[in-house]
């Protein structure tokens, strides 16, 4: 059974590629997370061909972790469902890399090694994997990134992503197959009216949750006229005064936050020896308070 740890907490991440063809103007990954120029990051994608073997090894290695720590965010620093990358990988590896990764998680689950897989995307091509994800729906959450409901505005800042319509269609397809879908508007472009329009659209297609952060990290006007090779104009901590932070569910009402006590990895001090907390949980884990949001469902 999945336990709530926190809104944005994921102990593990999995990225099968380095680089991304989507070319989003607001992308935080090149130069900041991965030390590559934006031009290189957006034009050259490296595929980690050995990731299936490494993944099987790692999932078994950490199988004894507390269940609330066995959470993997899939596709954080790259878009998983880039069409050209998927085709190239299948041609050169002889199999579908995403399908293989999903199979590994599913097989581990069937053998008693249960993990939660959180799939992040802004591409409609995820619907190719609907049948496979549907059989894993007890252990999968899909999160679509959408910055605005308007196609023209979206295309201005997201050069090569799927259209809003195709993303909404994919949300509907996944939802109709019983798969949990959340929409993430981070960053979000627009005002409260745009926000209401977007939430209405995604909930009408079957999305079960929506989240937005109070912080809007970018000065949107700085993107006008930029190219993929231009340096990112980042305004750290810029507040979006039009919106509060939202974490809502379709048909649900958010109630008072509560705190729960769970085990989390210890933070290392400078020079302190690394402790593998999967092997030595008593040494590597500490009790910590994590804030969670709980919901009461209401019928409208």
State the predicted function of each range.
Residues 1-141:
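Conserved Radical SAM active-site core
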Residues 118-120, 124, 187-197:
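Active-site glycine- and acidic-residue-rich loops that bind
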Residues 81-85, 151-157:
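A short acidic, helix-capping loop that chelates divalent metal ions and anchors anionic groups
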Residues 92-99, 161-173:
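Glycine-rich S-adenosyl-L-methionine
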Residues 160, 173-193:
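Conserved strand-turn element in the central/C-terminal portion of the radical SAM core barrel
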Residues 106-109, 134-137, 168-178, 248, ...:
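Surface-exposed amphipathic alpha-helices with a cationic face
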Residues 169, 191-300:
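Auxiliary Fe-S-binding modules of radical SAM enzymes
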Residues 72-74, 117-119, 142-144, 181-185, ...:
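Hydrophobic faces of well-ordered beta-strands that scaffold small-molecule active sites
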């Amino acid at each position: 059974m999945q336990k709530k740890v926190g809104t944005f907490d994921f102990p593990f991440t999995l990225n099968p590629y380095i680089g991304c063809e989507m070319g989003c103007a607001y992308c935080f990954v090149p130069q900041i997370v991965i030390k590559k120029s934006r031009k290189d990051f957006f034009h050259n994608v490296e595929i980690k061909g050995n990731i299936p073997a490494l993944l099987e090894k790692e999932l078994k290695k950490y199988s004894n972790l507390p269940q609330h720590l066995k959470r993997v965010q899939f596709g954080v620093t790259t878009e998983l469902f880039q069409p050209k990358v998927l085709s190239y990988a299948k041609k050169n590896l002889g199999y579908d890399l995403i399908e293989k990764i999903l199979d590994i998680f599913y097989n581990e689950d069937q053998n008693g090694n249960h993990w939660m897989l959180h799939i992040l995307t802004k591409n409609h091509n995820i619907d190719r994997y609907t049948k496979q994800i549907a059989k894993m729906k007890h252990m999968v959450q899909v999160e679509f990134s959408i910055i605005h409901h308007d196609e023209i505005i979206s295309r201005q800042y997201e050069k090569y992503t799927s259209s809003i319509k195709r993303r909404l269609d994919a949300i509907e397809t996944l939802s109709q197959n019983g798969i949990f879908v959340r929409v993430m508007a981070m960053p979000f472009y627009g005002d409260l009216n745009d926000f209401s329009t977007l939430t209405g659209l995604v909930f009408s297609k079957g999305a079960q949750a929506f989240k937005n952060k109070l912080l809007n990290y970018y000065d949107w006007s700085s993107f006008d006229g930029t190219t993929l090779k231009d340096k990112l104009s980042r305004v750290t901590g810029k507040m979006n005064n039009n919106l509060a932070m939202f974490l809502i569910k379709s048909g649900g009402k958010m109630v008072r936050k509560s705190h729960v006590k769970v085990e989390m990895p210890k933070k290392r001090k400078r020079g302190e020896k690394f402790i593998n907390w999967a092997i030595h949980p008593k040494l590597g884990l500490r009790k910590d308070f994590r804030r969670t949001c709980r919901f009461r469902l209401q019928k409208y």
